[in-house]
């Protein structure tokens, strides 16, 4: 993932180039606002590898990323919004042959799951991921991968083990806040 200001097309493309030279085959870029979303077309046109939009809070940013031609999205069930927003994103992803990564973080698990389990835990993360994947499947969308992250490495491992028993989707294993190049 880039750590540049996505709105700075020149700096972001330079970082993408450095990542590609080090072997990256796809690069994720943050899309925190519409100004960043407006830069995505230029990034897509200038990138030699597929780009994935990291989306939080505003489903319209996901729609803008898909309209700009990005190949994938990372969405967080804990903050993407209600079902009707997810449905719009899924329909746009299908229309654009894009992949969706359902990325669950223990720190942003949905409130009803926090209440059910008494706080963030392995089971809450897995239930969040699986219920969100079902929303995608309900719309006939299966180009999905899943990630689970906790500040506890042991909880992250346990969550992936539990998730792997429950589905056959590809699992995206990453390190949060790993730093830049």
For the regions a language model picked out, list residue spans one by one.
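Active-site mouth loops of central-metabolism enzymes
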Residues: 1-14, 30-32, 49-57, 78, ...
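N-terminal small/glycine-rich loop or linker at the start of catalytic domains
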Residues: 1-4, 38-41, 99-118
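N-terminal active-site wall of soluble small-molecule enzyme domains
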Residues: 11-19, 28-68
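Alpha-helix-loop-beta-strand connector modules within alpha/beta enzyme cores
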Residues: 33-55, 88-100, 131, 160-171
């Amino acid at each position: 993932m880039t750590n540049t200001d996505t709105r700075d097309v020149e700096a972001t493309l330079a970082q993408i180039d450095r990542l590609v030279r080090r072997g990256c085959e796809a690069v994720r870029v943050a899309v925190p606002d519409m100004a960043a979303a407006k830069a995505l077309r230029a990034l897509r046109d200038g990138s030699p590898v597929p780009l994935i939009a990291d989306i939080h809070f505003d489903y319209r940013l996901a729609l803008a990323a898909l309209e700009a031609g990005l190949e994938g999205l990372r969405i967080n069930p804990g903050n993407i919004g209600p079902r009707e927003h997810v449905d719009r994103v899924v329909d746009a992803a299908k229309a654009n042959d894009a992949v969706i990564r359902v990325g669950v973080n223990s720190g942003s698990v949905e409130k009803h799951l926090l209440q059910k389990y008494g706080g963030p835990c392995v089971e809450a993360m897995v239930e969040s991921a699986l219920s969100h994947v079902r929303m995608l499947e309900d719309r006939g969308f299966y180009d999905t991968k899943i990630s689970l992250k906790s500040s506890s490495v042991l909880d992250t491992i346990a969550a992936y083990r539990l998730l792997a028993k429950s589905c056959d989707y590809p699992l995206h294993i990453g390190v949060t806040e790993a730093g830049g190049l």
